[in-house]
Amino acid sequence: RLTAPLTRLQAASARIAGGDYAGRTGIKTDDEIGALSEGFDAMAAAVETRVDELHAAVRRERDFVAAFTHELKTPMTSMMGYASLLRAGPADPAATKEAADFIYHETRRLESLSGKLLTLLGLESDNAVEPAPVSDRALFAALARSLPPAEGVELQFAPAGCTVCADRILWEDLLANLVRNACQACRGRAGGRVVVACRAEAGCAVFTVADNGCGIPAADLPRLTEPFYMVDKSRTRAGGGSGLGLALCAAIAARHGTALQFESEPEAGTTVTVALPLAPARPTKEEPQ
């Protein structure tokens, strides 16, 4: 009677040692062996959870490397083809310009890709975020200055006088990526409009970027922040997108203790929402515009 539970405990230990992390003793008694078995099973459950997490992390890294390699290989192959055409000697001026334009466009896209990748990796460090009070008006003014005009898209800003505590550079990058995506969704559509707004609600500053563009199918919404995931690859690449923009936005939001929320309807538009706590009121000069 005494050795039976010990035998089961030994067998469960052997299973775990052999890589079967689902092994449990299943012993339920009101004595010291029962307490030992309960502790062993709890330890085994924790080990199994941690191993599953590590396996999932390895899969994510493997998928990321595969996607990144693909994103590099696809334009590089085409660029080599166009470069070979240029090296072959004098060609039709229109063909030469087409080749040069393609190489320039893809080079800029790869530059953007590498920059976003470096920012993503940098967000993993403990001191990646340097929060300070900043107003929505200052953020929106910076966006209006830095974003190039989007042909056929009206860009509107609606600040509410909210002040948040955020890393200004990162938060501007987050909003800029959302605005670029919204403008891209409106590309080629009559009456395209993107509204960047902020409102105070329940102690938070709620930022929204809304467009009346092509919208996103419901099945794609849960995957939008996956690195290199693109709803429409041809549209994204044609607009210079890398598939890392929303992944970067999600990482920046997470570093600020918040998250992106998406609402979208195909052919009607998309609204992205992200909230930050309002900064405590204090007498201070308005930060430079």
Protein language model annotation of sequence segments:
Residues 1-65, 80-87, 122, 227, ...:
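Membrane-proximal HAMP signal-relay module
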Residues 181-186:
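Short helix-loop "hinge" at the ATP-lid/N-box region of the Bergerat-fold HATPase_c
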Residues 191-203:
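Short beta-strand/loop element within the Bergerat-fold HATPase_c
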Residues 216-230:
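Short conserved segment of the HATPase_c
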Residues 254-289:
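C-terminal end segment of the histidine kinase catalytic
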Residues 211:
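Acidic ATP/Mg2+-coordinating residue in the GHKL
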Residues 105-110:
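Short alpha-helical segment of the dimerization/phosphotransfer core of two-component systems
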Residues 125-130, 163-166:
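Conserved micro-motifs of the catalytic ATP-binding
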